Amino acid sequence: LLAKAKGIKVITVASSANKVTRAKRLGANLVIDRSKSDVIAQVLKYTKNRGVDAVIDHVGAKTWPVSIEALKVGGRMLACGTTTGADTTINIRAFYSKEAQIIGAYLGSKSQLVSLHKFMKLKKIRPIIDSVFNLKDAKQAHKKMESSNQFGKIILKI
C-alpha cells in the first residue's frame, strides 16, 4: 500500500490462492503464486528481462536467493525480517555480478515513524491486521506466524 501510494509498480509474491486474491485487491501490479509458477521467470517476463529495481524481503532465509536473483543490475534489496530464519546462503557471484546492494532495516528512527504516520494519514492508508491475540495467547500468535497463514500483522494486546 505504501509503495502504491508513492506511485511505485508493485510485484508481490504470495504462497496461496487466497493471498494472491487479497494482494490483487490491494492493488499490486503483479501477484505471483510461488506454489504455482517460477517467481524469477514471472519477474523477468514482467520487467522485460531487466529485473526489479528493489526488493523488500521481510521473510528471511528461504527467500533471499530468489530476492537477489530478481534484482536488476544495480538493484537493491531491503532486508527487514527473519520469519523463515536468519541464516542463509547466497550465490555471491550472482550478487556481485549485479552490483547489488543489501540494506538492513529495523524499526526506523522516531522522526521516520512520525513521517510515516503522517503519510499514511494523508493517503488514508490503514495497516492490514490479520488477527489480534491477548498477551496470554502469545504462543498461539507465534504459531500462527510460523505457519505463514496470516495476511497482515498479528497483534498482541497488552
What do these predicted regions represent?
Residues L1-S37, Q42:
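Mid-domain Rossmann-like dinucleotide-binding core that forms the NAD(H)/NADP(H) cofactor-binding site
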Residues V43-V52:
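A short acidic, Gly/Pro-enriched loop at the edge of an enzyme's catalytic core
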Residues K6, V59-I128, K157-I158:
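Glycine-rich phosphate-binding loop and adjacent beta-alpha segment
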Residues K19, D38-V43, K62-V66, S115, ...:
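Short acidic active-site motifs
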Residues N49, K124-I128, Q140-I158:
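C-terminal capping/lid region of NAD(P)-dependent oxidoreductase domains
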Residues N29-I32, P127-F133:
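Structural signal for short hydrophobic segments within the conserved structured cores
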